[in-house]
């Protein structure tokens, strides 16, 4: 059965890649036009404290750049988060990402979104300090704590976008953890005592939100009615999550949460929330925790892209 699953994934990925290539070619965009049409932004906290307890709600001192004609150029937060009719898609990367790698990753995601998009969008990456250090387990624990604290910035960004009719969020690994925490804080929840000092406006949002998680490094119970991020789904229209029951990193997730028997949602899937559609990608990606393996080898990632783009056909193209 495992072999049949891998054969299915190989066939599905081939079809997915061929369709994507044809769609790009049909756009008639040469390389230069492709660069000029990008609307990709970076909001960075890499120059700030790793694990903030609070942020300034008026001016959180974020650094902003826009990818324009082949290079990253300085911009303002007002420009990055303006509501101009385009669909805002916010991406939060995972662990052990240098600044340059994060920038390359968001451009790769933009390529895949553009191949399936039927509407204009604005892709905004929240880049946080997650580079690799000499001690992997200790550094992963520190970055997990940092991703929890950076939920404050996700919540702040969501509040700036609160008047957008639709918002999409994509997170990989610890980035998914930041997104879930940010949604929880924006809805009035608390994490490690942060809420009282955030200054985040928790008035009801006008936005409908769609979320895509890839290998989420968070406990599978956190989105249950009594979970740590229980308010995260308050304004969420739907969550599509990809996990890998062969993930060698998330299999050891319990070591991140000291004194617990936690099981990662990216390893065994979420429990206790009917808003979540999820797929086990182990037959496709195998023993890895590499985000790019989901992009290249998992046909279900196409569903995530459609979900984030609010494509009308997403309900009809589910892969069972």
Regions from the language model: what does each represent?
Residues 1-9:
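Bacterial N-terminal signal peptides that target proteins for export
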Residues 9-18:
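Bacterial N-terminal signal peptides
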Residues 27-82, 95-97, 103, 107, ...:
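Lipolytic serine-hydrolase domain surface
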Residues 86-94:
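Short beta-strand element of the alpha/beta-hydrolase
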Residues 99-100, 177:
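Loop/helix-junction capping segments adjacent to catalytic residues or to phosphate/diphosphate-binding pockets
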Residues 163-171:
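Alpha/beta-hydrolase fold nucleophile elbow
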Residues 171, 175, 179:
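Gly/Ala-rich beta-loop-alpha elbow adjacent to hydrolase catalytic centers
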